[in-house]
Amino acid sequence: MSLEEQRTRDELKHKLLDLNQLHEQLAELRTICPSLLKLLHPETGTSRKFEKSAQEAIEKVNSFYTHLKSSQNVFDYAEKSLQADSSNLLPTYLYNSEDLSNDTENNETKSINGKSALDLKEPHHSELHDNDNFQNSDINIESFKGDIEASGSILTTHENKSFTLKLANELEFIFFHDTRGKFSVYCSSSKDDAITFSINRNNNFLGNLWSLMPKILDYQHLYSKPCDFCKSLISPVYLELPSVRRNANSTVKPTSKDILALHAECVPAQSDL
């Protein structure tokens, strides 16, 4: 076989190899393409089921919004009624141990080391905080006017010792006396439902005015400082909402230094007040 014939034969072999590779690639594509198309266009039955479920979900959401809108006058009436007279608020708290003891034992006492349980129990809230009366106390809402004005917040007073505080970031809180004579605070803002829900769920705003007011004013700085426990930033990116607490070591009227901003999971047990 001449040299020319050998070279021609080798070229034909290379072309055959290239042709075989093309056939193999074509076979792979024939297998892959239907799978890809199936992902892009699911089977008719699956698509219809998804569409039906989605439509049902949309109808339920629309029905909820319609019902909520039709009930808006009820919510408006409840809020105005609460502002007009805080006694209209029905108690939603559980009876404490003192109440249960009085109800079930008819004020019977047990002797402990020569003293009765009534002698050993803690003084009533009204005995500890006589100065918390809204109009007659040394520490009343007037004591915080400077802090409120400096923070850019707006205070609106109502009848029967209740008032509304709107922070500079538009979060709104209602202060009122509950049926036990203590101050209760409720976040009534609708600007950011996530923040409102977190504040209402993670805090028990109940007690005296001098400890509650600095806490509430501190909520205008939701994301401006790190967690006082783990020192990491309270990040709005991850929707980390702070849990504001008063420093347990503070025994005087708290200032901004006495307020702790903590991640919910970083609240030490000893700081819960």
UniProtKB/Swiss-Prot annotation:
Keyword Transcription: yes
Broad class of where this protein is predominantly found: nucleus
Protein's recorded name: Mediator of RNA polymerase II transcription subunit 27
Keyword annotations of the record: Activator, Nucleus, Transcription, Transcription regulation
GO biological process, one term: positive regulation of transcription initiation by RNA polymerase II
Localization of this protein: Nucleus
One Gene Ontology term, aspect cellular component: mediator complex
GO molecular function terms noted in the UniProt entry: transcription coactivator activity
Keyword Nucleus: yes
Disulfide bonds: none
Function: Component of the Mediator complex, a coactivator involved in the regulated transcription of nearly all RNA polymerase II-dependent genes. Mediator functions as a bridge to convey information from gene-specific regulatory proteins to the basal RNA polymerase II transcription machinery. Mediator is recruited to promoters by direct interactions with regulatory proteins and serves as a scaffold for the assembly of a functional preinitiation complex with RNA polymerase II and the general transcription factors.
Organism in which the protein naturally occurs: Schizosaccharomyces pombe (strain 972 / ATCC 24843) (Fission yeast)
Gene behind the chain: med27
Family named by the database record: Belongs to the Mediator complex subunit 27 family.
Assembly and binders: Component of the Mediator complex.
Pfam families noted in UniProt: Med27 (PF11571)
